[in-house]
């Protein structure tokens, strides 16, 4: 005898776009230095966030967060957050760890982008540089993983010709 599970009714959802991607960092100054230099852009804003709603929103009542928005290619926004709290600890940076995330930027030249990131202090996962993708949906692309500030993984992909 099999049981039929009924799915709960869910309210309608109309997601229209990615609003922003948030990264918690140890030093907002260091993070801004990397992202502004790497992307060749200026932050949209930087401010200390300390409104009463914020602590309720993020789960740390009374918190202050030094925050900035940086424009990403294609119109998305990168939000950088430095929580002003004692006792913060680094998340494990290994890409296989649950909860680990990465940002992937599409670039026109993976080798040049890799060299630029390394010159700005990024640590390559594959020291020889970008790898050629030889199978799957990105076959023909060139890609690289690098560790940037705070152990964050930055991926760059140069799409296959014609894609």
Which stretches of residues belong to each language-model region?
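A cross-kingdom feature marking solvent-exposed beta-strand/loop segments within repeated
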Residues: 49-56, 85-91, 130-142
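Core segments of cupin and vicinal oxygen chelate
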Residues: 24-75, 119, 139
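Short consensus segments that form the blades of beta-propeller domains
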Residues: 12, 59-60, 93-94, 135
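Vicinal oxygen chelate
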Residues: 1-14, 18-26, 66-76, 91-163
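Short, solvent-exposed aromatic-acidic interface loops
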Residues: 84-86, 161-162
């Amino acid at each position: 005898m099999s049981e039929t599970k009924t799915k709960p009714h869910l309210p309608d959802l109309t997601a229209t776009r990615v609003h922003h991607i948030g990264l918690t960092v140890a030093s907002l100054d260091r993070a801004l230095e990397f992202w502004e230099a790497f992307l060749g852009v200026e932050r949209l804003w930087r401010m200390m966030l300390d409104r009463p709603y914020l602590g309720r929103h993020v789960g740390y009542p009374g918190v202050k967060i030094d925050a900035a928005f940086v424009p990403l290619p294609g119109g998305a926004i990168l939000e950088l957050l430095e929580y002003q709290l004692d006792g913060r600890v680094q998340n494990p940076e290994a890409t296989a760890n649950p909860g680990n995330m990465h940002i992937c930027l599409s670039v026109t030249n993976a080798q040049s982008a890799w060299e630029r990131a390394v010159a700005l202090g990024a640590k390559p996962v594959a020291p020889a540089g970008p790898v050629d993708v030889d199978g799957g949906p990105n076959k023909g692309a060139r890609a690289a993983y690098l560790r940037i500030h705070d152990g964050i993984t930055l991926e760059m992909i140069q799409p296959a010709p014609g894609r």
